[in-house]
Amino acid sequence: KFQKNYYLFHIGAKLNKFCKQGAYVIDYFGSKELNERNLHLGWELANYRFEKFKIVKKKRNAPSLFHNHQNQVDNEKRVFYFVRDLINTPANVLGPNEIFNAARDFLKNSYNSKKISGSLLKKKFPLISAVGQGASKKKQPLFCELKLKKARSKKKVCIIGKGVSFDTGGLNLKTGSGMALMK
């Protein structure tokens, strides 16, 4: 199933690149809603541009696709664009605090956030603290937790992820080739 969705993303992106400016509708037959939505999401993701640091931003008359899943696709696209922006932002601009603040701002008021840093981090999470020994004072490591304010169901769901920012200065625990492949 994952592989099929992956191909649908790419088909949507290829269709977007193939179509010149204008408005398009795709007529489906025998398809399921999820397949259509993934194709439309692929179409939308093809329009992503990282222009955060550009003084002059390119105007692009991107082709548009009309479909019945606009709200859901727009929400998913917004998440993909946010993550891509984080990935493309250089480490000298986006450190641990900046990742935390960006995530908190993106999630708005629907989550409670807790941040552990400094001596408390060293006490509770000594290995995270140890890895960051070579970091500058402005880019010290931290541990954060984001919890949904309002429980939506009785089932508990736990998602564990990590946001890692790095530069190749400080303590070098990897080989040169290993450092080059980090991003």
Labelled PLM ranges:
Residues 1-163:
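Short amphipathic alpha-helical segment within the helicase RecA-like ATPase core
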Residues 103, 157, 173-183:
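Alpha-helical metal-binding/catalytic segments enriched in His/Glu/Asp
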